[in-house]
């Protein structure tokens, strides 16, 4: 599979990559090719893609409700895509589900960690999301070598202008 194999998409189709009213996400020609490739292979048109060169990965954002269709039962479709692209694209591929609210998006970004609540606050001139994570899932929310929290910070900044995400422990009140 070649990264140059395009379908009949036009640049005008990129309106779908703009999510929040008044918020424009810039898509480069290279990212556009990744979006087309993802769509052609998995049958789901992603909303956005970010190339994280530091972690050597592509992070695709799909519409709410499209995550299951994109990865397939047991992750089968995504595993097939990774296997087919192993020689052409030496990057890991991650998929996250978009949400119309910044709180919901942060919860999705930290998945599979259990996040019962997210608060968006202003701290000085910064916008900070405080994610309350179930104590047992704190390491899951951060991820191996901080990969998951880095991903969350990149995409929260890109889509909602959230400057930082902090993890707090969620404790359930005891009776």
Annotate the PLM regions:
Residues 2:
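Acidic, glycine-enriched catalytic cores built around paired aspartates
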């Amino acid at each position: 599979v070649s990264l140059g194999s395009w379908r009949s998409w036009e640049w005008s189709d990129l309106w779908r990559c703009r999510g929040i009213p008044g918020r424009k996400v810039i898509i480069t020609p290279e990212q556009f090719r990744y979006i087309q490739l993802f769509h052609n292979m998995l049958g789901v048109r992603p909303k956005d893609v970010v190339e994280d060169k530091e972690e050597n990965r592509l992070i695709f954002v799909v519409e709410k409700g499209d995550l299951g269709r994109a990865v397939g039962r047991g992750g089968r479709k995504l595993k097939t895509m990774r296997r087919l692209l192993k020689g052409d694209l030496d990057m890991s591929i991650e998929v996250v589900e978009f949400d119309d609210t910044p709180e919901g998006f942060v919860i999705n970004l930290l998945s599979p960690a259990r996040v019962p609540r997210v608060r968006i606050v202003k701290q000085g001139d910064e916008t900070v999301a405080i994610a309350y994570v179930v104590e047992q899932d704190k390491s899951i929310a951060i991820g191996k070598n901080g990969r998951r929290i880095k991903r969350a910070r990149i995409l929260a900044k890109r889509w909602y202008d959230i400057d930082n995400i902090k993890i707090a422990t969620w404790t359930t009140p005891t009776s």
